């Protein structure tokens, strides 16, 4: 005679209060920019594992995207696995099935699945367009290191979240989540999601200073960086928009102005044939002591 033992277990996780609005948001877009050590990716991983383990969200499936598919293994996949083991401890394998090839995670309670893809070329983008699930529907997408993606990549992903959810679990909703360090102030993500108000968008900001789990040594390290590398600290310490590395001209502002040569006191062209990038020609105007 075989006997089965019933396990009563309640998963537990610790969250940073700063991310409560993020985890409660039901709009279409959650856009999380933040400093290194802010805990944004850890929070998103735990939020997804908590929701996908909950019978209240039966039918929810998640697609996780990095620009390069292979980088998921040591980043998003590892982060989600870590969240499972934090929340379920020694019972993790009783509640979640882990598949290493291809990468996937499946909750044994709800049947909800997590799969991982990349969008580095047209072939991978086409694969994303044909994703289906045996149970439920693709309703959530997580783009980690989202600044690696082109706007066209995200548009393809966004198009995957469509169709009425009538007849399915009423708790389900479509949502794209992006997490990233805001490297460039000219990035398309800033223009699309941060520079104008949109009721479908939650644009969230966090830093290591709001992470209650950060250790004192890391905090001191970031304070040293503030003195030694102010621009790097702005991006990786404060989570502000900026530019890092490779810039020749760093002190400039972006404005609209007339490019007619007659509008300047002097005008010059310069050419850079480029070792790493394509040939470039730069027009420089001089007017009243200002360079354009």
Each PLM stretch: what is its role?
Residues 1-29:
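Pre-P-loop entry segment of helicase/translocase ATPase cores
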Residues 41-58:
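Walker A/P-loop NTP-binding motif
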Residues 60-72:
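Conserved RecA-like ASCE P-loop NTPase motor core of nucleic-acid helicases/translocases
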Residues 71-139:
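Inter-Walker segment of RecA-like/P-loop motor cores
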Residues 144-145:
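Walker B catalytic acidic pair
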Residues 148-226:
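ASCE P-loop NTPase helicase motor core
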Residues 211-273:
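ATPase catalytic-site recognition across NTP-hydrolyzing enzymes
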Residues 283-292:
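Nucleic-acid-processing active sites and adjacent nucleic-acid-binding tracks
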